[in-house]
């Protein structure tokens, strides 16, 4: 999503096309949170759902894919909200289930994982938010993230968490509303799970 504009038409069109290939689910980002919680725009969630996207708001869904049962849990908000809006209970409920072949956890803010989520059992974590650090420097990587400041640890890429889960932080497709991307190509992550 291009955060500098209010129109989500391009993202919703992309999501609609992706649902023709596979199930699509996701979580809201901070810009969507502002539109929904501060501006009362629940229509945005409806537009994503009408396009076939399941928006996970501290909830879990599961899919049967190629004889495997996949659990996807979506955690919204920031790490400091973890115990307030049902995210903790959602993670605990998923942890109690043992029928899943693959557990995926999605949280918009990557620091959610080391701060709150890596004590839970999941195989793959997905996040975004940092826009790849906006500016990327050769050999140093991401320059800045709102949560981590200069040279963020989770500026974009693949990481192994303490619980041995893989965390993929996408640089995403959109721009920041304050700075242009420099040396930081937008990305749409395609993850092949074997």
Give the residues covered by each predicted segment.
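Solvent-exposed loop/turn segments at secondary-structure junctions
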Residues: 1-3, 30-34, 61-63, 77-81, ...
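Membrane-embedded segments
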Residues: 1-54
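Binuclear metal-dependent hydrolase catalytic cores centered on His/Asp/Glu-rich metal-binding motifs
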Residues: 39-53, 65-107, 113-115, 178-181
């Amino acid at each position: 999503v291009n955060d500098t504009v209010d129109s989500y038409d391009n993202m919703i069109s992309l999501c609609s096309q992706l649902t023709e290939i596979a199930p699509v689910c996701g979580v809201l980002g901070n810009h969507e949170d502002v539109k929904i919680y501060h501006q009362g725009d629940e229509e945005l969630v409806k537009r994503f759902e009408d396009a076939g996207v399941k928006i996970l708001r501290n909830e879990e869904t599961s899919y049967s894919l190629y004889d495997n049962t996949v659990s996807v849990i979506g955690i919204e908000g920031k790490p400091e909200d973890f115990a307030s809006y049902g995210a903790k209970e959602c993670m605990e409920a998923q942890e109690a289930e043992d029928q899943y072949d693959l557990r995926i956890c999605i949280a918009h803010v990557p620091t959610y994982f080391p701060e709150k989520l890596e004590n839970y059992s999941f195989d793959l974590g997905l996040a975004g938010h940092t826009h790849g650090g906006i500016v990327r420097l050769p050999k140093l990587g991401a320059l800045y993230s709102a949560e981590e400041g200069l040279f963020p640890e989770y500026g974009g890429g693949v990481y192994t968490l303490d619980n041995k889960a893989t965390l993929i932080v996408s640089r995403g497709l959109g721009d920041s509303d304050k700075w242009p991307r420099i040396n930081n190509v937008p990305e749409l992550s395609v993850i092949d799970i074997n």
